[in-house]
């Protein structure tokens, strides 16, 4: 019953959206993990996998009727927002770099991500994921600043007796 109540809160819905965005961002970059020319994409993949796991664990914690203190929750999500934003920047810079390739004896200079949509899509999802994580951090700060207000990260009714 507690899991159903937890799933109805805006905080939990935001966590689900973050989980999906992290999943999409690392899933589309998965096949670049062993490509030596694109090793900088591994950072985006690793950070998104880490975010995906942490968000999934936190959803389980919320479904069990627990929640982190709002300030700790805000700090964790702010840290991940910064890491995801750095991963976005690394991916965007790598995609805009030029590389020289040799095809049939001809040397061609082109952008790293030219003709490839996966890194661009992953960068876009990482950017949006960073915004969502920053929003989660703001929600944690709001809950910390107003302790008398209903907790945004919890699903328990503050007026009911325990």
Curated annotation (Swiss-Prot):
Cellular localization per UniProt: Cell membrane
The protein, known as: CASP-like protein 0U1
Keyword Cell membrane: yes
Family: Belongs to the Casparian strip membrane proteins (CASP) family.
Source organism superkingdom: Eukaryota
Keyword terms: Cell membrane, Glycoprotein, Membrane, Transmembrane, Transmembrane helix
Stretches in topological domain Extracellular: 33-43, 91-123
Subunit (UniProt): Homodimer and heterodimers.
Residues with glycosylation annotation: 96
Any one GO CC term of the record: plasma membrane
Cytoplasmic topological domain: 1-11, 65-69, 145-162
Membrane-spanning residues: 12-32, 44-64, 70-90, 124-144
Membrane association type: Multi-pass membrane protein
Signal peptide (from-to): none
Keyword Glycoprotein (UniProt): yes
């Amino acid at each position: 019953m507690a899991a159903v109540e937890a799933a109805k809160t805006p905080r939990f819905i935001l966590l689900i959206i973050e989980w999906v965005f992290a999943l999409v961002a690392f899933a589309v970059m998965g096949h670049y993990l062993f490509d030596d020319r694109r090793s900088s994409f591994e950072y985006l993949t690793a950070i998104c996998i880490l975010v995906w796991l942490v968000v999934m664990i936190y959803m389980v914690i919320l479904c069990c009727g627990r929640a982190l203190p709002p300030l700790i929750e805000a700090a964790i999500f702010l840290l991940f927002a910064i890491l995801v934003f750095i991963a976005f920047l690394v991916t965007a810079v790598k995609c805009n770099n030029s590389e020289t390739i040799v095809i049939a004896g001809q040397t061609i200079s082109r952008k790293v991500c030219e003709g490839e949509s996966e890194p661009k899509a992953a960068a876009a999802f990482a950017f949006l994921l960073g915004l969502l994580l920053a929003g989660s951090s703001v929600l944690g700060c709001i809950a910390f600043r107003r302790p008398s207000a209903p907790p945004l990260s919890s699903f328990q009714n503050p007026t009911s007796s325990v």
